[in-house]
Amino acid sequence: IKGMDVWRPYGWKTMKLIDSLTHKQMEITDHEEVNFPLLIPENLLEKENALVARLKKAREEGVDPDELRDEDEEGGFKKEVYWVKHAGENELDIPMFLRPTSETAMYTMFPLWIRSHKDLPLKIYQMVNTFRYETKQTRSFIRVREIHFFEAHTAHADEQCATRQIQQDLNIVDNIMNDLCLPIIKAKRPVWDTFPGAWYTIGIDAIMPNGRTLQVASCHHYRDQWAKAFDITYENIEAKQEHVHQTTYGMSERLLGAVVGMHGDDNGLIMPPSIAPFQIVICPMIRKNAEVDTV
């Protein structure tokens, strides 16, 4: 199927070893793993589209999003999703779509999980397959329609706490990229390249041997914009209700594509030790005194 990879054992084992590096960092930084459904109801997509369109317009015009009304513009993932509209021969009352990412699904649950300042910070992550109808030329590991996706979502008491989370995410990136032996650039994206639903985006680009860059991860600061749309509030220490501030951090199998591009050539691929499916140790065999001196 175009844009949907078949993983053979060697490649899948390598990908799982990369995942293990991420799991380790998540455990160190007190993130908890979750798993959300693949299908999301259509009404949540409409909610996201209205929010993202308004945030995008506000950023372009340099005004506060609260000063704008919801627009009819489709600024979310609507043009990229795969739809499920039938169950057997029966048409569904509410169409479902395959998740392109999980903000809408997760943030529907956050108001049930967050009630007090004692519930913060909330730090969760999942590793799942997501689906986006990528209309451009697909390429294994680099631009696909079924994505092996890591996503971390956090909620915090205020903007400053969320900003500190972004810095922690960047430290996590440093650790993982060091294990993968990938040189990177971390850069705040300009307005036109910021995720439409974010206050700002920091992209992480691997520097490839030909001098070009390949984005391998991204961190987004949402401030309280999504919390207002999904009514995610908490009671602060003064018994007043406030909206949480949120962040996200994502990576995909593009990491493996970067590893292949960096450490492979026409003669083959040399894996970094941390993700090599097979480990080889060369042991010198010493038999004579003369050979001992030589070694």
What label would you give each PLM region?
Residues 1-295:
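NTP/phosphate- and nucleic-acid-binding module
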